[in-house]
Amino acid sequence: MKKQLTKKQEEILEFIKKRIKEKGYPPAVREICEATGLKSTSTVHGHLTRLEKKGYIRRDPSKPRAIEIVDDDFYVHRNVIRLPLVGKVTAGEPILAVENIEDTITLPYDLVGTEDAFLLRVKGDSMIDAGIFDNDIIIVKRQNVAENGDIVVALIDDEATVKRFFKESDHIRLQPENKAMEPIIVKDVKILGKVIGLIRRM
């Protein structure tokens, strides 16, 4: 049985739940300060530590927003899904190998539409004309095939690249959405998934 909470701890917990419901991810410590009238981030950290010890939340101290509600019913009722954020992609390893996972992010299920998906942080500006910018997080549906015109995550020389896919007569063209860049022409390519959405934190 979980230990009882103080009024302030209840207020903080409810704000965290509200923010996850509205935004799909938990608030930063400073946002908790502002919402609950606490002046010091160290005071919030103290309350979060007690909420964790009492079994209401889980945290990863190495990540600033990694607060997870310890209540599976909460996630079911809020109709959200937790997806892995892949930090790196390596040839010969499963895309979701534990050592490749950088974080886990909670998103509304309606935004994703499938559990067979992962998140990947975009590096570079090769897709800016498609509205995909450096440091955006893309939502990728796992699949190993693609249709012409799909934006895909493909593995090239041990590195993941995001490009538009075109299968032509005797080769595959991975087309950037940036007029300053040339397409990548390959005989064959490993498709990791199709891009179905993106997240941009302002």
Curated annotation (Swiss-Prot):
This protein's UniProt keywords: Autocatalytic cleavage, DNA damage, DNA repair, DNA replication, DNA-binding, Hydrolase, Repressor, SOS response, Transcription, Transcription regulation
GO terms of molecular function: DNA binding; serine-type endopeptidase activity
Transmembrane segment boundaries: none
Alphabetical list of CDD domains matching this protein: S24_LexA-like
Domain of life: Bacteria
Catalytic activity: Hydrolysis of Ala-|-Gly bond in repressor LexA
Any Pfam family the entry gives: Peptidase_S24
Regions recorded as binding DNA: 29-49
Top EC class of this enzyme: hydrolase
Keyword DNA-binding set for record: yes
A GO BP entry: proteolysis
InterPro entries membership: LexA (IPR006200), LexA-like (IPR039418), LexA/Signal_pep-like_sf (IPR036286), LexA_DNA-bd_dom (IPR006199), LexA_repressor (IPR050077), Peptidase_S24_LexA (IPR006197), Peptidase_S24_S26A/B/C (IPR015927), WH-like_DNA-bd_sf (IPR036388)
Entry EC no(s): 3.4.21.88
Positions of the catalytic residues: 126, 163
Site (Cleavage): 91-92
Xref: HAMAP family: LexA (MF_00015)
Subunit text: Homodimer.
Function comment: Represses a number of genes involved in the response to DNA damage (SOS response), including recA and lexA. In the presence of single-stranded DNA, RecA interacts with LexA causing an autocatalytic cleavage which disrupts the DNA-binding part of LexA, leading to derepression of the SOS regulon and eventually DNA repair.
Family: Belongs to the peptidase S24 family.
Protein's name in the database: LexA repressor
